From Swiss-Prot:
Binds 1 Mg(2+) ion per subunit. Pfam families: ATP-grasp_2, Ligase_CoA. Belongs to the succinate/malate CoA ligase beta subunit family. GO terms for molecular function: ATP binding; magnesium ion binding; succinate-CoA ligase (ADP-forming) activity; succinate-CoA ligase (GDP-forming) activity. Disulfide bonds: none annotated. It catalyses: succinate + ATP + CoA = succinyl-CoA + ADP + phosphate; GTP + succinate + CoA = succinyl-CoA + GDP + phosphate. Residues 9-244 form the ATP-grasp domain. This is Succinate--CoA ligase [ADP-forming] subunit beta. It comes from Nautilia profundicola (strain ATCC BAA-1463 / DSM 18972 / AmH). Succinyl-CoA synthetase functions in the citric acid cycle (TCA), coupling the hydrolysis of succinyl-CoA to the synthesis of either ATP or GTP and thus represents the only step of substrate-level phosphorylation in the TCA. The beta subunit provides nucleotide specificity of the enzyme and binds the substrate succinate, while the binding sites for coenzyme A and phosphate are found in the alpha subunit. Heterotetramer of two alpha and two beta subunits. The lineage of its organism: Bacteria, Pseudomonadati, Campylobacterota, Epsilonproteobacteria, Nautiliales. One of its GO terms (biological process) is tricarboxylic acid cycle. Mg(2+) binds at residues 199, 213.
Length: 390
């Protein structure tokens, strides 16, 4: 789960991670009031969407008067912001964050992620603040300094010193940086975050460090421990079909291809997408119906997959362990009665009661339900069907 910049900064401040003062607004007059309360003569108006690259897309603007704050906010609210992370459809701006202007001496990058290879959190820093970190990693990876942190000992001063030396910070700034980085580590660990990114982390004229931007992502499986963070979820920023799928216990992620996938188990779902690619196709989604699949969840799965107009075929790939294949076969037939399935459905069922399942599908004699002998055969048929070649 991701949250907005203003929400991430609220969490930062609770842990003593310094940020500029600011407030959220939903209308132009509200934005003006926030700027008035902040005082000063320079403000930044920032579109609040779950995507990076806002500045380049016109979603971050400076204002030098209260009138300008109101005008920029009114122009920004309701606009569709298209960045490299939103896709071509973009995201509609429904709120803006008004922040006091800052005295920027230098821009840095600081972030934390979980390194799955090392099985440890990693803190990363770079002198290339303000740039896309993916671009820095691709073109000048030597400019990214990393430290892996063993949770058993936690974040230590030597971790921060390594980052500070790599950033070339003078001695009089290192103590302030160590304090900042230590607080950020606590934010990450205490809240079960998956990712934190501050880009840019700025140095001010008086040698202070401020989080000028803030991104946070959380482990959905840990949200039950953090109800106050779960309340920050903005469903408007999420794919509607993904939200709908969660209500039925389905794990669904929309992709850009045309071969719909319905699979039980995340590992098998990933393998299914891989083999579709291998056969020359493009998966339209990731959909894990889980171990407790029943006719209702299968029907809902079809409904969600078919809500994507790009889907030209569906590959149902089920390995029956806990869930019986005959139950899935009956679920598929019941689903076709509830939902208009107007594309070829290639079905590969293996495992518990697979033969009974094959018999059920054969006896049903439904034209667009096509059995597959194995995984490879199923993927080939699904890709061919999507291309209109089956």
């Amino acid at each position: 789960m991701n949250i907005h910049e203003y929400q991430a900064k609220e969490i930062f401040r609770k842990y003593g991670v310094p940020t500029p003062r600011g407030g959220v607004a939903f209308t132009g007059p509200e934005a003006r009031r926030v700027a008035e309360e902040l005082g000063g003569n320079l403000w930044v108006v920032k579109a609040q969407i779950h995507a990076g690259g806002r500045g380049k897309a016109g979603g971050v603007k400076l204002a030098k008067s209260l009138d300008e704050v109101e005008k920029i906010a009114e122009e920004m609210l309701g606009m569709t912001l298209v960045t490299h992370q939103t896709g071509p459809e973009g995201k509609v701006v429904k709120k803006v964050y008004i922040e006091e202007g800052a005295d920027i001496k230098d821009e840095l990058y600081l972030g934390m992620v979980l390194d799955r290879a090392l099985e440890m959190p990693v803190m990363m820093a770079s002198t290339e603040g303000g740039m896309e970190i993916e671009e820095v990693a691709e073109k000048t990876p030597e400019k990214i300094i990393k430290v892996a942190i063993d949770p058993a000992i936690g974040f230590q001063p030597f971790h921060a010193r390594k980052l500070a030396f790599g950033l070339g910070l003078p001695k009089d700034e290192q103590r302030e940086f160590i304090k900042f980085a230590s607080a950020l580590y606590n934010v990450y660990m205490d809240n079960d975050a998956e990712m934190i990114e501050i880009n840019p982390l700025i140095k001010t004229g008086d040698g202070k460090f401020l989080a000028l931007d803030a991104k946070m992502g959380f482990d959905d499986n840990a949200l039950y421990k953090h109800p106050e963070i779960a309340e920050m979820r903005d469903l408007d920023e999420e794919e509607p079909t993904e939200v709908e799928a969660k209500k039925y216990g389905l794990s669904y992620i929309k992709l850009d291809g045309n071969v719909g996938c319905m699979v039980n188990g995340a590992g098998l779902a990933m393998a299914t997408m891989d083999i579709i690619k291998h056969e020359g196709g493009e998966p339209a989604n990731f959909l894990d119906v889980g171990g407790g699949a029943n006719p209702d969840t299968v029907a809902k799965g079809f409904e969600i997959i078919l809500s994507d107009p790009n889907v030209k075929s569906i590959f149902v790939n089920i390995f029956g362990g806990i869930v019986r294949c005959d139950r899935i076969a009956n679920g598929i037939l019941q689903a076709t009665e509830k939902v208009e399935v107007n594309v070829p459905v290639i079905v590969r069922l293996d495992g518990t009661n697979a033969e009974e399942a094959a018999e059920i599908l054969r006896n049903a004699n439904i034209k667009n339900i096509i059995p597959a002998e194995n995984l490879k055969d199923g993927a080939k048929k699904a890709v061919a069907a999507a291309k209109g070649e089956l």
